């Protein structure tokens, strides 16, 4: 695992004293304080767009191998990713998040780039699994791209072989945090 993967694993919320640490607790506490003081919120249009964007991620699957099965699990009733504001779409023109899951071969790399270019701005990429992150088990094969970040810019790396549905869900929540704190409409 690389340093990015270790960082992703250690940024997870942990239990301290029987209480689960909320990753965005300070953000929501500040909003609650402002609403309690004034009874309303004053914000900029840009902040409103950022807030709306975090709750309406439309993602498309680019399932290339066995990690795609875990993407299916995340949409089933047990996890139901739509509760977190992420809904699947079939067309790249309708989606703003691409989840690349599985081994990316040299022949498939131009197709991945073409689909990425068809997405509307702002667009985000989640790299799911060891094969998409760095080639994985097939790293030394002549036909494997050693990480989809060589073809498209990646925002979130989800480690594992295959990563669990919980790990992908955590990656989506990390992407929502990243969008919320980016501070600009354009990426």
UniProtKB/Swiss-Prot annotation:
UniProt region (Disordered), positions on chain: 1-22
Pfam families per record: Oxidored_q6 (PF01058)
Assigned keywords, A-Z: 4Fe-4S, Cell inner membrane, Cell membrane, Iron, Iron-sulfur, Membrane, Metal-binding, NAD, Quinone, Translocase, Transport, Ubiquinone
Cellular localisation: Cell inner membrane
Keyword Iron-sulfur: yes
GO cellular component, one term: respiratory chain complex I
Signal peptide: none
Gene Ontology molecular function terms on file: 4 iron, 4 sulfur cluster binding; iron ion binding; NADH dehydrogenase (ubiquinone) activity; NADH:ubiquinone reductase (non-electrogenic) activity; quinone binding
Cofactor note: Binds 1 [4Fe-4S] cluster.
Biased segments, Basic and acidic residues type: 1-10
Membrane topology summary: Peripheral membrane protein
Top-rank taxon, per record: Bacteria
EC number, as in UniProt: 7.1.1.-
Catalytic activity field: a quinone + NADH + 5 H(+)(in) = a quinol + NAD(+) + 4 H(+)(out)
SUPFAM superfamilies in the cross-refs: HydA/Nqo6-like
Cofactor: [4Fe-4S] cluster
GO process annotations (BP): aerobic respiration; electron transport coupled proton transport
Binding site for [4Fe-4S] cluster: 66-67, 131, 161
Subunit note: NDH-1 is composed of 14 different subunits. Subunits NuoB, C, D, E, F, and G constitute the peripheral sector of the complex.
General function of this protein: NDH-1 shuttles electrons from NADH, via FMN and iron-sulfur (Fe-S) centers, to quinones in the respiratory chain. Couples the redox reaction to proton translocation (for every two electrons transferred, four hydrogen ions are translocated across the cytoplasmic membrane), and thus conserves the redox energy in a proton gradient.
HAMAP family hit by this protein: NDH1_NuoB (MF_01356)
Family the UniProt entry places it in: Belongs to the complex I 20 kDa subunit family.
Record protein name field: NADH-quinone oxidoreductase subunit B
Native organism: Erythrobacter litoralis (strain HTCC2594)
Upper taxonomic lineage: Bacteria, Pseudomonadati, Pseudomonadota, Alphaproteobacteria, Sphingomonadales
